[in-house]
């Protein structure tokens, strides 16, 4: 990545990039995550999208995909902007999504890192601003943030006995202590419960036009939800089938989704797959289907000429 003048002269925290310097994308990511380098964040944005503005659009699109629906990003560094905002819940959704990326998980858990420094015989020594990596043994990662407008902000994650939680505090003077208390509360007072198991048949669809007569809906992957210790599990299951679903269906085809929610809030989902083949119940219908497909394919060929 070649560092632009705009990136090199970013205000706020910095890893002291120089205009024209060349540095790897991975080193820049360490600079962003460990040292809160605003210059590194802009260099990444310009490398990926060509401009901060275009990168912010990608940020907003990805945020919505993670479930962060009440955020709007205008820059990659978090510097104040009237139209740049987020919520604690949204930050938790983004962190949960990011932790699934192995590269991100490795970087955010790193305490110290030396990255390249072009033109010098030594590298840049980075120390993670996230003190929880030293204070709280179960910490798996996190990101600090501070501006006068936002105050002290912290997103952090911790894992214990196979369960991982994310805690977020915004404008919080006692961020280190409060996040530790939140993570203790989440790890000690909640448990993970399996709602459906992989391979479970959760419903049968009657299909009179088929030879088999019915189609079993199988769960592709298990779905877990988190509930309070001692609490009862009351969730809503919603089956959403593909609108274009038609015969024939092959065993193993993805035919829809199962969504698990509570009080309108999505807790988890998984694909539904066909548990059996589903074929036409007569030679005539099979022939009609073959002719229809042949006609469609011929039309595509004519349209493409």
Q: Model-found features: residue ranges?
A:
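Active-site-adjacent loops and short helices of periplasmic peptidoglycan-processing enzymes
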Residues: 1-89, 93-102
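Domain-terminus/edge residues, biased toward the C-terminal soluble/receptor-binding domains
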Residues: 69, 80-85, 89-305
